[in-house]
Amino acid sequence: MLDRLKIIKQKYQDLQKLLLNEQNINQKIDILKNLSKLEPTVELFNRYLNLETEFTQIQTILKTQQDQELLLLAHQEKDTILSEKKTTLDQLKILLLPQDPFDKKNVVLEIKGASGGNEANLFAADLLRTYVKYAESKKWKVEILNLNPSIKGGLSSVELLISGKNIYSFLKYESGVHRVQRVPATEAQGRIHTSTAVVLVVPEAEELELKIDWHDIRTDTFNSSGPGGQSVNTTKSAVRLTHIPSGISVACQEGKSQHENKDKAFTILKTRIYNQMLTAKQEEENKHRKNLVGTGERSEKIRTYNYPQNRITDHRIGLTLQKLDIIMEGKLDLVIEPLIHEAQKEQLAQS
């Protein structure tokens, strides 16, 4: 591992020299990108090397010093350095882990009310609010691609495009069944009801990764409708795209024009086709490895939200927090960061 870190540091230094001599602006940009990727690892490795030097100096003091007070201080410093070395080495191991190729991607996030009738749709709306607040805290951009409100309030489904930095690395653990336990506003007896919403997070497909021939897509237009199906305009601005080879169909009416709805529908369609490809690949990979943090499948129950007890439980890692009210205000890192750490531990154990 240390040999690998030395190679990375040497590469970083070579790139720094190249940058000083490079005149081509495009080449400079590429070099700067590569430097920024290597910089966190090199900085941490330099910290580790400094600790090694300090440790050697302390060892010398312990061998040569006679003063008991200084020896006591040196022993304390030695323990501190050893602890810092271990922490730094663990951090370096994580930085050297293979990166998920999708981690830097934007995502399309879909939320659907599932079992539990109207309460499921209300919970879907609550989840939407939470994810939007979380995205805002990260300075991510959120665009609603398609939104289907339910008749009695809440949402039957919604699809968002979330754009920004390293989004999939944070949100990829959100796919699955989210279960809510609470007393509905209409419940006169005060009984707790259980309902569910399904979340699906898919990395946004790029043109180079997925080629779709427009000859394979059927386009239908129709009038936009509101909750309950009533028509809300007289022009056919809503669009349905059907990918004939896969049978995947997407309808979109959120935009103000047919052109806007067609663009949004195509974004969703690409994502669903892409997800179909990724799911098949993931199923094959899951046959060969244990995945403690979950499969990411939409049928997997991942989390329970218990409102009467202000409790949230992530079933994949056995995490329980009495902070549901805070988390629903967008503080999702309280759950997501432990999931990331558990996934890293799993990777380290398998590497």
Curated annotation (Swiss-Prot):
InterPro entries assigned: PCRF, Pep_chain_release_fac_I, Pep_chain_release_fac_I_sf, Prokaryotic/Mito_RF, RF-1
Superkingdom of source: Bacteria
Positions where N5-methylglutamine occurs in the chain: Q230
Keyword entries, A-Z: Cytoplasm, Methylation, Protein biosynthesis
UniProt xrefs under Gene3D superfamilies: 3.30.160.20, 3.30.70.1660, 6.10.140.1950
Entry-linked SMART domains: PCRF
GO cellular component, one term: cytoplasm
Family: Belongs to the prokaryotic/mitochondrial release factor family.
Protein name: Peptide chain release factor 1
Organism: Onion yellows phytoplasma (strain OY-M)
